[in-house]
Amino acid sequence: MARTPIDITLPDMTGSRAVVTGASDGIGRHIATRLAAAGAEVVLPVRNPDKGRTALAAIEAAVPDAQVSLRTMDLSSLESVAALGATLRAEGVPVGILILNAGVMTPPERQTTVDGHELQFGTNHLGHVALVGQLHPLLVAGRARVVSQVSVAANQGAVHYEDLDWERSYDGMKAYSSSKIAFGLFGLELDRRSKAAGWGITSNLSHPGIAPTALLAARPEVGRSRDTLGRRLIRVMSARGILVGTVETAGLPALLAATDPAADGGRFFGPSGPRNLGGAPAEQPLYGRLADREQAARIWDLSLRLTGMTGLGTPAAGRDIEAAS
């Protein structure tokens, strides 16, 4: 079956700095490439320098005049996130777009971050919360558009408040869903807090549907070294245009959330095909689990406490964050 071409047109982004996490490969690299092609100056925080250099070369090959550079950051280490924040604040360039795309998915065995949190909760959620806190002065200065990349998994399960780090009984898929629900709730609360305080930050959510990405591929570093029938099936379906998306189309919802003037905060974008697994990007109703404002406020307070970003949103936020780093 021939796949119908799917794309969106990005506005001219010359003069705007964009920061994209998880851009070493897959969806994140495609997002970064499109932003660079639109004229943005793109910063790629990467954990693996070799993969980062490969991504940089690929983006520069696709966009010869790209303004793109690497920085070092490991989302599973709050100290590493703080170091990146200090570096970017020292550079003093306002951030106009922040796309929080990086993630880790379903390690078969429980693993922890440098700071002792369950790997998915600590990386997918807390690491990104800390990054928002560290970059807050630059986000305000750039009247930034922040996009939190969640998942169809945020439509199942719940935040595991009674055991956030899954120390008693680990279930990889449930832990993944919990991390993505928490992350989505925080992204929506960020928009509400910004509007209330006049920060000028616009925060939306997106999800990529399903596509053959590194998140689904063999990941020896999280204990997944074998390919599986399910992953092979997704690759075949993607290549034939059946139900799921491609790496390129899966990045479009985040790009739409980041650049569409109608995406004015608190909105949710994803693929519009059957079961929202593939297809053209479009706004979608919030998953019920993400629409609970009381839970969002709870996650906000809890997340800032766990990341040491409790000064976020106060008049002294910039000084508090500087001191924390």
Please give the residue ranges for each predicted region.
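Rossmann-fold NAD(P)H-dependent dehydrogenase/reductase core
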Residues: 1-223, 306-318
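Short, contiguous pre-domain boundary segments
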Residues: 1-5, 278-289
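Short, contiguous strand/loop micro-motifs
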Residues: 18-19, 240-241, 286-287
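A short, hydrophobic secondary-structure junction motif
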Residues: 21-23, 76, 123-124, 245-246, ...
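Pocket-edge positions in alpha/beta enzyme catalytic cores
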Residues: 44, 73, 242, 288-291
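A short C-terminal helix-loop "cap" of Rossmann-like NAD(P)-dependent dehydrogenase/epimerase domains
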Residues: 167, 223-238
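C-terminal helical subdomain
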Residues: 179, 231-283, 293-297, 301, ...
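Short, intrinsically disordered terminal tails adjacent to the first/last structured region
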Residues: 322-325
